[in-house]
Amino acid sequence: MADEIATLISSAGLTNETFLVLCVIAVIVIGAIVVIITSRPILDIYPYLTPSASVRARKGRLFDEKQLSEIVETNNVHEFENYLKGVPDYADVLEEYPVDKALDIQCADTYEFVARIAPKEIRSSFVVMSKKTDINNIKSLLTAKEVGLTEEETEDLLIPRGVLYEDLRSLIDADGVTDVVTSLDGTEYAAVLEDALPKYENSGMVLALESALDKYYLESLLRSSNVPADENKQILFSYVGTQVDIANLKLIIRAKKDNLSYDDIAPYILEDGYQLREWKLKDLMESPDVTNVISGLEGTKYSDVLTDAMAKYNENASIAVFEKALDAYLSKSAKSLSMKKPLGIGPIIGYVSQKETEIKNLKIIARAKREAGFPNSKIMEMLI
């Protein structure tokens, strides 16, 4: 056997030393390939290790069902606030701000925290989410100017967070809505607000400006995640896309409740939806009423959850039942997505969604506790 190998080496014109060198190189190359193949999963996981640990720690501090029930059982808004003051995550902000503003600050801090720690490949979507604070502050400022609030009342509406907070705070003495819009020149929101300004001037209502900001936010959010190159980004795209679909549905349902036409709604709908594509959205916008919007969703993943809410809608004619059903669906969908990549994006999506739900539920409880004698059983029904 050895003689045959030696003969083959000689016939190839190689010396024994050259052959040995080639063998060593081959072993190194094969070894490198094996290392790359086996280490790739580790390389994919590594960027998520620290962020996942951070959000898991915070997730452990979220209220469980027992704690939420205890909060519902508080007798009034004062007891409600005292309960939250015993929770480190809420204690500091509640010492300085009223409860509604404190909850908004907690939400803003959550977005900023996740945008800061998220791995680079998915960070852009969470950065966009963190901009909701600036957008909400702009909307509050526009509303304040529309209804003629004082400077003090206007400042109370602003959430002391976000990139533009100080700039917006300096505009509380602006002369009116148009002055606010022109003063935002140089920000990323300038163009979208200026484009919507003629509609405001024709109608005298800031709804056109607010809706333009909402659409810009959804466009930015969808654009930030629309290249699902790997499983983590695919999950992110599903999470973001579902948010866009639900925002479109809420807008269409509200519009049909107010008997608005296709032409009234279309400018504010994001046509590039996720599962609800342009043709389907067009059909829904052309529906004559809320009931036909719901029936028009047959065959989509939103059909069952909204159909189940129809009975309550028929009882009280309140579209709040649909909005709650959609919020609950988003929460359930996020929970399902969070389990698909436990060593990747999963914990991040799970935490953000659960924190959003917690804050929404706390706001529901706070509003109810301001009404004397509001039944606790009714509050539990209202929670997401």
From Swiss-Prot:
GO terms for cellular component: plasma membrane; proton-transporting V-type ATPase, V0 domain. SUPFAM superfamilies: V-type ATP synthase subunit C (SSF103486). It comes from the Archaea. InterPro entries: ATPase_csu/dsu_sf, ATPase_V0-cplx_csu, ATPase_V0-cplx_csu/dsu, V-ATPase_V0D/AC39_subunit, V-type_ATPase_csu/dsu, V-type_ATPase_csu/dsu_dom_3. It is a peripheral membrane protein. One of its GO terms (biological process) is proton motive force-driven plasma membrane ATP synthesis. Component of the A-type ATP synthase that produces ATP from ADP in the presence of a proton gradient across the membrane. Belongs to the V-ATPase V0D/AC39 subunit family. This is A-type ATP synthase subunit C. It comes from Methanobrevibacter smithii (strain ATCC 35061 / DSM 861 / OCM 144 / PS). The gene is atpC.
